Curated annotation (Swiss-Prot):
Gene Ontology biological process: glycerol catabolic process; glycerol metabolic process; glycerol-3-phosphate metabolic process
Catalytic activity: glycerol + ATP = sn-glycerol 3-phosphate + ADP + H(+)
Regulation affecting activity: Inhibited by fructose 1,6-bisphosphate (FBP).
CDD domains (alphabetical): FGGY_EcGK_like
Domain of life: Bacteria
UniProt gene name: glpK
Free-text function comment from the UniProt entry: Key enzyme in the regulation of glycerol uptake and metabolism. Catalyzes the phosphorylation of glycerol to yield sn-glycerol 3-phosphate.
Family: Belongs to the FGGY kinase family.
Annotated metabolic or biological route of this protein: Polyol metabolism; glycerol degradation via glycerol kinase pathway; sn-glycerol 3-phosphate from glycerol: step 1/1
UniProt-recorded name of the protein: Glycerol kinase
Protein species of origin: Azoarcus sp. (strain BH72)
Coiled-coil features, chain-numbered ranges: none
Molecular function as annotated in GO: ATP binding; glycerol kinase activity
Length: 496
């Protein structure tokens, strides 16, 4: 039997899972690692710790499955996106901590570029992205400017840049492969997503030398092999994708209009838009989903800052619950929020608003309002923010959405999933396997290595746990949306 090893390198932990040819999980391993916050707005990882945690997980997963690396048909990689690493080619040693996707240290640089008028609508359409510290370009420029002698060495070809997938593959291959897939590259602000190639004008804008960039490879397909010294055998590296692209693939969103939402600390909603990127008029992100030879799939993406983090605030900020899982029972004590509306703009609002000055607010409180109403309003807010994204995508010409596939920790909350179906007016489908990021990495690699012929062969691997069907009338839906829109408008620009 063939086996596939999926490496799932996330923001707070590294995971590894072994899948068999029937798509069954044979083992799971996880290692947490350290996040550092050296200054306000800065978030860093130790690149060496990322490697140790990920490769230790891989070895643990193989041992737990009772397998040797030589029995693997392929390795697939899914990774936290945008996080930026700069290393020395000769030694493989990182020259500085990795700058994490959440890091905001380059906000002033982005503001300066906007003020100079060099960021145009044409560049936004070329990249599919907003000019924001979230993405890799200004992070890399910061490293080149602040690590001693880095810019000269980068221009001389002595240094390598990569997102976390590149960093992992470099060391997994013993330094023989400096690559990234088109989907990860699309999150750097340096890729023309239409040509799927590095763009000279963007490199010039951010002052990035081409010599530091990785080679672009398909998301699906063998790009090289692991060094036998790492896992004990040379194994084809056959699939690479950013975590949200991998989750979309793992959710089998293979046709245009299909979408998934990951309910984690934040929420990430991706909709397959087919072979053509959609130009958003609602400040959504257009990105490369995955590529295989001449075939390429694009996606429209919206990000919500406060998903499960809203529930964490109920626990840590208000003390309404002791564990996050208790929110469902508390919210279920009341039939609705009793007119209470929570706008969880604690760190501003993400798509489609992109309002950094918005702030969290509770509206509609009366003497009769209690903890259950606030808990219900928190779940409503997660569902309503997702509804905002879906309606923006529809207005951009994507879709229409017929069902929403869900994953992530909060997808286990039945009340939230029912509220989501009611709010969207379409079925919400929860699969049995909620670890869809690792599953997606395995599926990409399995197709790339020939374990599975194509996406049709993956059909048995995605199975439904439960379908939540909408119960609200359109009038109910409209009334809730109107009240939400009023509350959001009141919370905006609060800190401006």
């Amino acid at each position: 039997m063939s086996y596939v090893l999926a490496l799932d390198q996330g923001t707070t932990s590294s995971r590894a899972m072994v899948f068999d040819a029937a798509g069954r999980v044979r083992s799971v391993a996880r290692r947490d690692f350290t996040q550092s916050f050296p200054q306000p707005g800065w978030v860093e990882h130790d690149p060496a710790e990322i490697l140790r945690s990920q490769f230790d997980c891989a070895r643990d997963a193989l041992a737990d499955a009772g397998l040797r690396a030589g029995q693997l048909a392929a390795i697939g990689i899914a990774n936290q996106r945008e996080t930026t690493v700069l290393w020395e080619r000769a030694s493989g040693r990182a020259l500085a901590p990795a700058i994490v996707w959440q890091d905001r240290r380059t906000a002033a640089k982005c503001a300066e570029l906007r003020a100079r008028g060099v960021w145009s609508e044409a560049l936004r359409e070329r990249t599919g992205l907003e000019l924001d510290p979230y993405f890799s370009a200004t992070k890399l420029a910061w490293l080149l400017d602040h690590v001693p002698d880095a810019r000269r060495r980068a221009e001389a070809g002595e240094l390598a840049f990569g997102t976390v997938d590149s960093w992992l593959v470099w060391h997994l291959s013993g330094g023989r492969l400096h690559v990234t897939d088109h989907g990860n590259a699309a999150r750097t602000l340096l890729l023309d997503i239409h040509r799927r190639d590095w763009d000279d004008a963007l490199l010039a804008l951010f002052d990035i030398p081409r010599a530091v960039l990785p080679r672009l490879v398909d998301s699906i397909g063998v790009c090289g092999e692991s060094d036998p010294a790492v896992l004990g055998a040379a194994v084809p590296i056959a699939g690479i994708a950013g975590d949200q692209q991998a989750a979309t693939f793992g959710q089998h969103c293979f046709a245009p209009g299909m979408a998934k939402n990951t309910y984690g600390t934040g929420c990430f909603l991706l909709m397959n838009t087919g072979a053509t990127p959609v130009k958003s008029s609602h400040r959504l992100l257009s990105t490369v989903g995955w590529t295989q030879g001449a075939a390429h799939t694009y996606a429209l993406e919206g990000s919500i800052f406060m998903g499960g983090a809203t529930v964490q605030w109920l626990r840590d900020g208000l003390g309404l619950i002791r564990e996050a899982a208790e929110v469902e029972a508390l919210a279920a004590r009341v039939p609705d929020s009793g007119g209470v509306v929570l706008v969880p703009a604690f760190t501003g609002l993400g798509a489609p608003y992109w309002d950094a000055a918005a702030r969290g607010a509770l509206f509609g409180l009366t003497r009769g309002s209690g903890p259950a109403h606030i808990a219900r309003a928190a779940l409503d807010a997660i569902a309503l923010q997702t509804d905002d994204l879906v309606r923006a995508m529809t207005a951009d010409g994507a879709g229409p959405l017929h069902e929403l596939r869900v994953d992530g920790g909060a997808a286990a909350n039945n009340l939230l999933m029912q509220l989501q179906a009611d709010m969207l007016g379409v079925a919400v489908v929860r699969p049995r396997m909620l670890e869809t990021t690792a599953l997606g990495a395995a599926c990409l690699a399995g197709i790339g290595a020939g374990v599975w012929r194509d996406t049709d062969a993956l059909a048995p691997h995605w199975q439904i746990d439960r379908v939540f069907t909408p119960a609200w009338s359109e009038d109910q839906r409209g009334a809730v949306r109107a009240r939400w829109a009023d509350a959001v408008a009141r919370s905006r620009a609060w800190a401006a």
